[in-house]
Amino acid sequence: MRIKASEVKVGMRVWSKTLGEYFIVTEIRNNGEEITLSDGIFSMIGSTDAVVRIKQ
């Protein structure tokens, strides 16, 4: 299932294109443009990465 970056919520399990695996979103910053993943890595969601996959 694909969703827009603006629909990402804390606690969602999302796919990181950079790391190639799923992580839990722990924090959302800058009006949804930057998210913190459960491994502590920041993921920028910009025009090149406008959608993320969530695990069902």
Predicted feature residues:
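Mixed-charge, Lys/Arg-rich low-complexity intrinsically disordered regions
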Residues: 1-9
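Intrinsically disordered, low-complexity, charged/polar segments
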Residues: 40-56
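Short, solvent-exposed secondary-structure boundary/capping segments
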Residues: 33-40
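Short beta-strand-centered aromatic/proline hotspots
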Residues: 21-30
